[in-house]
Amino acid sequence: MEPHLLMLGFLSFTIVPGCWAELCLYDPPEVPNATFKALSYKNGTILNCECKRGFRRLNELVYMACLGNSWSNNCQCTSNSHDNSREQVTPQPEGQKEQQTTDTQKSTQSVYQENLAGHCREPPPWRHEDTKRIYHFVEGQIVLYTCIQGYKALQRGPAISICKTVCGEIRWTHPQLTCVDEKEHHQFLASEESQGSRNSFPESEASCPTPNTDFSQLTEATTTMETFVFTKEYQVAVASCIFLLLSILLLSGFTWQHRWRKSRRTI
């Protein structure tokens, strides 16, 4: 069974055999002068089959997915030109193919024998692959950040980012890492030591709005609305009473005038 990608409104899901994984809609956060890398990929992760310029995907293989401990499909690129005889690989005998596949599998198993259940290692490169790989991570994925050459790390916490549910939505946590020039490292280090851990606090507590604030705002709005409604109803009631009183007085006046004229005619 092949994995499929399902887009439903603003939510993205990956459907793989025996797995329903929600995708992280955004890429991991960028840290200046640092790069990130996943040491392993969770079950359901998707990698686009991208080819470098002048080449295209072969057999319409759009992506490969992490299923269990291995990647489904194999990305292949072929030349866009009609004369691509040099890019064609001479077919090998079936026995030689099987032997080569077996050797490759043994080599892969020996290197990645510590694979975690439900995780895949970095997929092997393919010919004419694009320089940048585009992954679609799933919830629970962890990426590790490292400073580029010429920079050193200043960190108050783990230099990792995790795709997880925060405040009811899936997002990446921000890595506690700052990369500074090696020549200025000692200056920043002294500043960091003076600050200590004053600014360190869990992201879940810092990012989520306080429920009490929303409740107080809602209560205030409700009270204001009730006051407005009460004032308007009061004005309507007063106006109705005045109108009724004037009607009674006017009716009484007409009645008295009618009786007075009648009594005068009798006399």
Curated annotation (Swiss-Prot):
Residues on the Cytoplasmic side?
A: 257-267
Can you list the GO cellular component terms from the UniProt entry?
cell surface; external side of plasma membrane
Disulphide bonds in the chain: 24-66, 49-75, 51-77, 120-163, 147-179
The signal peptide, as residue positions, is: 1-21
Q: Where in this protein does the record put region Disordered?
A: 82-108, 191-215
According to its UniProt entry, the protein's GO biological process terms are: activated T cell proliferation; activation-induced cell death of T cells; inflammatory response; inflammatory response to antigenic stimulus; interleukin-2-mediated signaling pathway; lymphocyte proliferation; negative regulation of inflammatory response; negative regulation of lymphocyte proliferation
Q: Which PANTHER family match?
A: INTERLEUKIN-2 RECEPTOR ALPHA CHAIN, INTERLEUKIN-2 RECEPTOR SUBUNIT ALPHA
Q: What is this protein called?
A: Interleukin-2 receptor subunit alpha
Q: Provide the taxonomic classification.
A: Eukaryota, Metazoa, Chordata, Craniata, Vertebrata
